[in-house]
Amino acid sequence: MNQGKIITVSGPLVVASGMQEANIQDICRVGHLGLVGEIIEMRRDQASIQVYEETSGIGPGEPVVTTGCPLSVELGPGLISEMFDGIQRPLDRFQKATDSDFLIRGVAIPSLDRKAKWAFIPKLSVGQEVVAGDILGTVQETAVIEHRIMVPYKVSGTLVAIHAGDFTVTDTVYEIKQEDGSIYQGSLMQTWPVRQSRPVAQKLIPVEPLVTGQRVIDTFFPVTKGGAAAVPGPFGAGKTVVQHQIAKFANVDIVIYVGCGERGNEMTDVLNEFPELIDPNTGQSIMERTVLIANTSNMPVAAREASIYTGITIAEYFRDMGYSVAIMADSTSRWAEALREMSGRLQEMPGDEGYPAYLGSRIAEYYERAGRVRTLGSQEREGTITAIGAVSPPGGDISEPVTQNTLRIIKVFWGLDAPLAQRRHFPAINWLTSYSLYQDDVGSYIDRKQESNWSNKVTRAMAILQREASLEEIVRLVGLDSLSEQDRLTMAVARQIREDYLQQNAFDSVDTFTSFPKQEAMLTNILTFNEEASKALSLGAYFNEIMEGTAQVRDRIARSKFIPEENLEQIKGLTQKVTKEIHHVLAKGGI
């Protein structure tokens, strides 16, 4: 522990002298109020400290005391369904303790509730050899999440005591005799520094798709469990709604939602909606698997920078249990702006658009903590973290540094388009500019698992949309009637794909989520119509006759998005009806 005194205060940056025994990344208590801060630069005996609370009212001469510990999070039962701020202060208990709707400075409240008791069920017995990562026992944290208590990193030896029963997170639950003869006394809780990634046994290639229930994503631009994706787009294009939809319906075990510098109303929406929504995979409330980290735009800027790391560290903890985790960061641009502000106050040499030169490496550090891994421990298990970050480029200009540095790292780009959003086409993901480098892996995985030709259908559908884009300029110049019959069919089918398949209403109880079997049935119907109509044209039928003769079945295809999942056979039955009606047009002899 080292005590110095403040010599400079500049917004969230405080400079203290007499800190020669302090270390970089140490947590400090700043001023008489004891504000939480972190040392980010050392020069001789002077330490530059970024303070995670409002610094108004503190001045030179006030004390600064280091704790000797880096910024860490508490990991244990009580994380799920909880809402924290950027440095893991529990907002609900904070409000009750301070009787204030705003964060009172200098108040220290433990991240995990010290009074709550959890029923611990041992899985190992006394005398067994254990290594770091082994699961000692479980706590049923919510109806859907079994919290697995693991041996902490760098601890191994013989289990000499383990107790069943109800315990708080600080009670001693087990004892391990280590190789040096010392006894390690463990509780249900462990801590971990947020800027250090948790170790794994092996990194694996991600192949299993993350099913989001959003048709444009799952069909054309899938992300794998363990992948990394970015959602850049201008204001009002629907970034937050896309993130909310994935948080609600993705087929993962745990969701970590980080609201980083965005509007407080959006976090309020999450708090209001999530408890009422039912997870289609478990039948329980979505809050039963969700951790919320709220660092809204009116909270201290420095804490934004920490909130992303807090979220990914909690995600790694659940991954190490063997769970699949999705972390949503909304928005990484606000996080980068916090980096820029602190860099400016430190008088560092600016890079592009004033961002620090190390912006790219910081973004890479975050996304590289995602992935599919084999975890530590003698019991073999796999876990995944899927990182999905929203990016808010000013004016929708994706050539700005945050977007460009993000695109170098991630493998899935869901580019939101302002013209699509203005036409009320949501999700406004542009199918011509977006991409997924997992497309081939996911396609092969689905073809193998489903024994279908899914990847071929996706390729055909995308070819139709690309052909439509190439014909659009001709149509604008000389009109639709100037096109050949085949090209007019392509334009009609492309419109069907856009309006009846890609367009999705997030606020409709049925259309908000589409399972993979339903997606395949819907796409098959549209492609069958294209195939059969194309054959009919080659046999001499007229385009207008085909469109008139199939008007009823095309209308049913358009409405199939509103057919509930349990009536899937109704959608599948439309394939035969399409073929039958086109054959009927040919039989009438429209040649």
Curated annotation (Swiss-Prot):
SUPFAM superfamilies tied to this protein: C-terminal domain of alpha and beta subunits of F1 ATP synthase (SSF47917), N-terminal domain of alpha and beta subunits of F1 ATP synthase (SSF50615), P-loop containing nucleoside triphosphate hydrolases (SSF52540)
Name the GO terms of the biological process aspect: proton motive force-driven plasma membrane ATP synthesis
Q: What is this protein called?
A: V-type ATP synthase alpha chain
UniProt record similarity statement: Belongs to the ATPase alpha/beta chains family.
Keyword match Transport? yes
Quote one Gene Ontology molecular function term: ATP binding
Xref: InterPro entries: ATP-synt_VA_C, ATP-synth_a_Xtn, ATP_synth_asu-like_sf, ATPase_a/bsu_AS, ATPase_F1/V1/A1_a/bsu_N, ATPase_F1/V1/A1_a/bsu_N_sf, ATPase_F1/V1/A1_a/bsu_nucl-bd, ATPase_F1/V1_b/a_C
Enumerate the residues binding ATP. 233-240
GO cellular-component terms in the record? proton-transporting ATP synthase complex
Annotated PROSITE patterns: ATPASE_ALPHA_BETA (PS00152)
Q: What is its EC number?
A: 7.1.2.2
Reactions accelerated catalytically: ATP + H2O + 4 H(+)(in) = ADP + phosphate + 5 H(+)(out)
Role this protein plays: Produces ATP from ADP in the presence of a proton gradient across the membrane. The V-type alpha chain is a catalytic subunit.
Keywords tagged on the record = ATP synthesis, ATP-binding, Hydrogen ion transport, Ion transport, Nucleotide-binding, Translocase, Transport
What Pfam families does its record include? ATP-synt_ab (PF00006), ATP-synt_ab_N (PF02874), ATP-synt_ab_Xtn (PF16886), ATP-synt_VA_C (PF22919)
Give me the gene this protein comes from: atpA
Q: Which domain of life is it from?
A: Bacteria
